[in-house]
Amino acid sequence: MTAQLNKVRKAIINGCNPAMISDLLDDLQDKHVLKDYEVEHINKKNNTSRDRCRDMIDSVKKKGEYSSNILLESLVKNHKTLAESLGLHEHAPSPIQEHNEDTIKDKEINSVIPCSAEEFKNIYDSHGDKIYEVREREGRKRLALIICNETFQSMSERRGAKLDLEGMNKLLNELGYQVQQHTNLTKAEMVKAMKEFAAREEHADSDSTFIVLMSHGDKPGVCGTDSKKTENGQYGVTNLLQVDEIFSTFNNVNCSRLWDKPKVIIIQACRGENQGGELVRDDVAPAPLEDDAVHHVQTETDSICFYSSTPDTASWRNPTKGSVFIIRLIEKMNELAHCQPLGDIFLEVQSSFKDKSPNQYSQMPTQERSTMTKKFYLFPGY
């Protein structure tokens, strides 16, 4: 539809009048294609009807196929004479516009399903100011941080970690985030990387962030590459990145540019050695699936943390496929991010771990101490 709108763009501009433009802007605003401030900007910025019309069309085109389709449909339904002169006629919604849920369920989903204009409108109509604001793509600078430790000075290699890194990188890119990626960092280097990321000026032009940590772990924290298991240490491991350090780095004092914006922390690491099953673990002791675990201390406002397992238990990783938690998280995000808030998607991930047979390796991801005050929709494609 963007190509079709581009084809008739000049003719629409030449045939427009003030009343028609006002009608179209009202319709686009009602259907959440254009926001209030965008309509106000179009009206105030332009002195002539032609300029207003040109600005309106170009603003809609930038939003993609769905938005372009809505503008053309509005033109056909409300301004038939002009539409007919342009060769535009009423048509059924395109297959892209309406997701066929049966088709989606019947095949493996390897990429994020985009949010349609209809879904976007329905979500805003249903929830309104109860959802976190999503900034327009133009000028938006979403950032995400991934730290993935695979090799260690005194611990086993986390085989399969590269697959987790590739999968999370792809997922976050498809959700519109520019990923800052680090591998094999010591505890001090992890702290430095987080502080530098928290200080980035681009957060002022963002609407949210993801922080993903994947490593070996123990109950109080996440292992750096220099972590070692001790005989008499309080927690048994040295050089742990304490979970409290993660949250304090991104609180409203230390990361003010992300104030009032969702901050999503995802941790794939063991939190102990108790097993709900057996694969390979990401605790400090070697085990063939491998496990990862960690403990949560404090969260800040508008934050949510999703752990790969409950306290004192292991998290499992397949050396040839990647971590079970990361695999299922990516699957559910690909499938549901277009229509469900993040908290509900996390519940779907948790449900996928429930009621496994005694012969299967078990773990239970947990959402802990969320301080989200609204629903967080990702609206992929917007």
From Swiss-Prot:
Keywords: Cell membrane, Cytoplasm, Hydrolase, Membrane, Protease, Thiol protease, Zymogen. It catalyses: Strict requirement for an Asp residue at position P1 and has a preferred cleavage sequence of Tyr-Val-Ala-Asp-|-. It holds the Pfam family Peptidase_C14. Thiol protease involved in a variety of inflammatory processes by proteolytically cleaving other proteins, such as the precursors of the inflammatory cytokines interleukin-1 beta (IL1B) and interleukin 18 (IL18) as well as the pyroptosis inducer Gasdermin-D (GSDMD), into active mature peptides. It is found in: Cytoplasm; Cell membrane. The keyword rRNA processing does not apply. One of its GO terms (biological process) is regulation of apoptotic process. InterPro entries: CARD, Caspase-like_dom_sf, Caspase_cys_AS, Caspase_his_AS, DEATH-like_dom_sf, Pept_C14, Pept_C14_caspase, Pept_C14_p10. Residues 1-98, 283-292 form a propeptide. Its EC number is 3.4.22.36. This is Caspase-1-B. Heterotetramer that consists of two anti-parallel arranged heterodimers, each one formed by a 20 kDa (Caspase-1 subunit p20) and a 10 kDa (Caspase-1 subunit p10) subunit. Belongs to the peptidase C14A family. It comes from the Eukaryota. The two subunits are derived from the precursor sequence by an autocatalytic mechanism. GO terms for cellular component: AIM2 inflammasome complex; IPAF inflammasome complex; NLRP3 inflammasome complex; plasma membrane. Transmembrane segments: none annotated. The active site is at H216, C270. GO terms for molecular function: cysteine-type endopeptidase activity.
